[in-house]
Regions:
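Enzymes that bind and transform nitrogen-containing heteroaromatic metabolites
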Residues: 1-136
Length: 136
């Protein structure tokens, strides 16, 4: 999992290119907010559980974090989108087609979301980094 890999890279316990190590050190210093109904232990540095009502807790976090909150879970993204709590999407599209595996909104959404393109940047790998804002 990320919580064991990135701290090891930051400490130098895992082999990694310098740019990855630099990213790991920055990530280690950042606050991390965890949504879980089962976990009680959060060993990663600066980890904080989000408890109680998800809508209220995430809205408070958004209000307290004007630069934004990054999330990394398809299930959480689906639920936050359902609660209308996602303002922007940053997507990285790789030049591969997978005929199997999970999709971002595997269980679907209640309605269509209109998005406005903020930026699209092709990367050397062939992937495209795209930034969208919700059209309201």
């Amino acid at each position: 999992m990320m919580e064991s890999y990135w701290p090891a890279v930051a400490r130098g316990d895992e082999e990694a290119p310098p740019a990855m190590r630099e990213w790991a050190v920055k990530l280690e210093a950042k606050p991390k907010y965890v949504v879980s109904s089962t976990r009680k232990d959060f060993p990663w540095t600066n980890s904080h559980p989000i408890a109680g009502d998800l809508r209220t807790s995430v809205q408070k976090l958004k209000d307290a974090t004007p630069d934004g909150v990054l999330l990394g879970s398809g299930k959480l993204a689906t639920e936050l989108d359902r609660l209308d709590l996602i303002d922007e999407y940053k997507l990285l599209v790789h030049p591969r087609i997978s005929g199997h595996g999970p999709t971002l909104y595997e269980s679907g959404l209640a309605r269509t979301r209109r998005l406005e393109l903020i930026s699209a940047k092709p990367l050397r790998s062939g992937a495209v980094a795209m930034h969208y804002r919700r059209a309201r």
